[in-house]
Swiss-Prot record:
Gene name of this polypeptide: Gpr107
Cytoplasmic side: 284-292, 358-367, 423-443, 496-551
Phylogenetic placement of the source organism: Eukaryota, Metazoa, Chordata, Craniata, Vertebrata
Annotated glycosylation sites: N64, N209
Cellular component terms (Gene Ontology): clathrin-coated vesicle; early endosome; Golgi apparatus; membrane; nucleoplasm; plasma membrane
Name of the featured protein: Protein GPR107
Keyword set includes Signal: yes
Length: 551
């Protein structure tokens, strides 16, 4: 466990950060990672998704159920309620067909199921029945029960069944044809193993090895509870489960599709840092045309770069030891939260034209920020909870759905300032005498609107679909597309709103300042016979002008 080092700080800013740091300390559990521990108490769900992991050859999974008990209403026997586990194998992260059934569907009652191994518990009989499909041992690994608590080695053979007449099937590591058991190879093979029972709770351990390349894939482990039909209305069967899951590939605790992520994050962090450095050089070179929003834009790539570096470090420790280091995880979550909030604030400020054409936000603009900022903080908190919570917990699904909804609302909200600016420019180009400048800025805003829509489309929709379409070992392409789209969005936004005298976005600011000054002067009787003379230097119109008398 990581040792916490007390940090000291002074000033009024640090006390404001203390509640956030305390929240992050509570959310981050150093024991979580690819070595999983899940404890459920009096749970009433029919199906619990315990974990999903992509395995290469020589990978393995060890599942240790230290306690599993069922609490049934009076009059219902143990055999009336079926409980057990299922191990599903797919080639990608798509949805399993057998899990898309209605609520009353119970996979444990199915006699034949392709690519799914079932473990059906008999608590009263202190045993578990393993129902394997015909391809078990060839395209699917065999489930091995063992009383040994040690992690199995790659060359370890499956343990012999506790039932002698079921011990005829042995796995062949060289991929040769397995021996025929008491059941035909084209039918479902069933084996029975004895398990330990104490005070109504059972405990046992099983594991499997990926011995051939044909067995590689994305494996999902589920817990199922099939209530009895004898239950009366309002009655429920609850269960308590304490389980530890260890899963590992040959050289990493990361899933097959996550192994390249540390290197990917470091590479993208370098690109974001270089883009930020180039942007700082442009700002220093064009100091006379720089606004406050340009410096806010400069902070964004550096914050993103830091977030990616800490994310890479976090994944490095998970890869090497199976769980993150608490300190690095907290630092990553802080930078991720700041990056997310800064990104949406910057996009909204550019859309409203703050610091470019106006220095005070309108009431409509303020309402947008009052909506976007809390939603973005909530989205980042949901992300942190999801990252530091096991999939099988009841709150995991709730926070995952909340993150999707809140992120969608944020993406929709930041489009409103751009739409309002486009509508305002359309009206202004038809009324005032500066139609050319307004039309140029209108074209720029339309490009920015399309840019935001494309960014949302690629990072929220295309990348999401890619994650479910590509094979399990290429799942990291989802993150590559997401980070690449973000980098392209940063570069194009900087190019569109770069500090330059020929930028229509900045020219409008200077022309409107002149227009406001003319309206003030013409309403003054003292300056009635004065006309404005603009000073021109280096081909650019300066915002301030001098006045001379005409009398």
């Amino acid at each position: 466990m990581a040792v916490r080092v007390p940090l000291g700080c002074t000033g009024s800013f640090c006390p404001r950060l203390l509640p956030l740091l305390a929240l992050l300390e509570l959310l981050v559990d150093p024991s979580l990672g690819r070595v999983h521990h899940l404890a459920l108490k009096d749970d009433v769900r029919h199906k619990v998704h315990l974990n999903t992991f992509g395995f290469f050859k020589d990978g393995y999974m060890v599942v240790n159920i230290s306690s599993l008990s069922v609490n049934e209403p009076e009059g219902v026997k143990d055999k009336d309620t079926e409980i057990g586990f299922s191990l599903d194998r797919t080639k990608n992260d798509g949805f399993s067909s057998y899990l898309d059934e209605d609520v009353n569907y119970c996979i444990l009652k199915k006699k034949s199921m392709s690519s799914v191994t079932l473990l059906i518990l008999d608590i009263s009989g202190s045993g578990v029945k393993v129902r394997s499909p015909p391809e078990a041992g060839k395209q699917l690994p065999e489930i091995v029960f063992s009383k040994d608590e040690k992690v199995p080695s790659r060359s370890q053979e499956p343990a012999v069944s506790s039932n002698p007449k079921d011990s005829k099937v042995q796995r062949t590591p060289d991929g040769s044809k397995a021996q025929r058991s008491t059941v035909d190879s084209k039918t479902i093979a069933e084996k029975f193993f004895s398990i330990h029972k104490n005070d109504g709770a059972v405990s046992f351990q099983f594991f499997f090895n990926i011995s051939t390349s044909d067995q590689e894939g994305l494996y999902s482990l589920y817990f199922h509870k099939c209530p009895s039909s004898k239950l009366r209305s309002g009655e429920q069967v609850s269960f308590s489960l304490n389980i530890d899951i260890t899963e590992k590939n040959p050289d990493s605790y990361l899933s097959a599709g996550e192994i390249p992520l540390p290197k990917l994050y470091v590479s993208m962090a370098l690109l974001f840092f270089l883009s930020g450095t180039v942007w700082i050089h442009i700002l220093r070179k064009r100091r006379n045309d720089v606004f406050k929003i340009h410096w806010l834009m400069a902070a964004l790539p550096f914050t993103k770069s830091l977030s990616l570096v800490f994310h890479a470090i976090d994944y490095h420790y998970i890869s090497s030891q199976g769980f993150p280091i608490e300190g690095w995880a907290v630092v990553y979550y802080i930078t991720h939260l700041l990056k997310g909030a800064l990104l949406f604030i910057t996009i909204a400020l550019i859309g409203t034209g703050w610091a470019f054409i106006k220095h005070i936000l309108s009431d409509k603009d303020k309402k947008i920020f009052m909506i976007v900022i809390p939603l973005q903080v909530l989205a980042n908190v949901a992300y942190i909870i999801i990252e530091s919570t096991e999939e099988g917990t009841t709150e995991y699904g709730l926070w995952k759905d909340s993150l999707f909804l809140v992120d969608l609302l944020c993406c929709g909200a930041i489009l409103f300032p751009v739409v309002w600016s486009i509508r305002h420019l359309q009206e202004a180009s038809a009324t005032d005498g500066k139609a050319a400048i307004n039309l140029a800025k209108l074209k720029l805003f339309r490009h920015y609107y399309v840019l935001i829509v494309c960014y949302i489309y690629f990072t929220r929709i295309i990348a999401f679909l890619l994650k479910f379409a590509v094979p399990f070992q290429w799942k990291w392409l989802y993150q590559l597309l997401d980070e690449t789209a973000t980098l392209v969005f940063f570069v194009l936004t900087g190019y569109k709103f770069r500090p330059a005298s020929d930028n229509p976005y900045l020219q409008l600011s200077q022309e409107e300042d002149d227009l406001e000054m003319e309206s003030v002067v013409t309403t003054s009787g003292v300056m009635e016979n004065m006309k404005k003379v603009k000073k021109v230097s280096n081909g650019a119109v300066e915002p301030q002008g001098s006045w001379e008398g005409t009398a």
